[in-house]
A protein has these predicted regions:
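Active-site hotspot residues in diverse enzymes, especially metal/ion-binding acidic/histidine motifs
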Residues: 1-155
């Protein structure tokens, strides 16, 4: 199994942990866009998506829609509502990628290295900033809680 396949399997495991069904079909054409439906807690993941390097991010994005609870509607008349749902899907997708990196001891010295490694498009770079800032905040908070519980001193 290569690194991309490992990440995809890990994402499928995350979906399963959150009672999200991931359906695939080997016959889907490479341009069939992956989708998700919150009510069914289901993701339709296209294993033939081209370019192949985008497959993990598209799966993480669709899982992100369900985890965020935002319903995406292609018939939505209010573009800002749809953009918010897409942004939430993007943010959670990046947070999932960061969690994968953390659990697999993968580190990057810069955000740009993360962006390049996962082929994150320019349209999602603001969410990379949001996700990394949130992750750093959560790590600092956890460290403070551990320090307080072990020493009784606030850092």
């Amino acid at each position: 199994m290569n690194k991309m396949e490992d990440l995809i399997e890990w994402l499928k495991g995350v979906a399963k942990e959150h009672n999200i069904t991931v359906l695939t079909e080997s016959q889907w054409p490479s341009d069939w866009v992956p989708q998700s439906q919150i009510e069914l807690r289901c993701v339709w993941y296209n294993p033939n998506w081209f370019p192949a390097c985008e497959r993990p991010l598209t799966l993480a994005h669709e899982i992100g829609h369900i985890l965020s609870g935002d319903e995406v509607s292609l018939s939505c008349n209010y573009c800002s509502v749809n953009e918010k749902a897409e942004s939430d899907g993007d943010l959670i997708a990046i947070m999932l990628l960061l969690d994968y990196c953390r659990t697999h001891d993968i580190t990057f010295e810069t955000k740009q290295q993360l962006i390049e490694a996962f082929r994150i498009p320019i349209s999602m770079t603001e969410n990379v900033d949001r996700a990394t800032n949130f992750t750093l905040f959560a790590m600092r908070k956890k460290y403070r809680e551990l320090a307080i519980s072990s020493t009784g001193v606030f850092i």
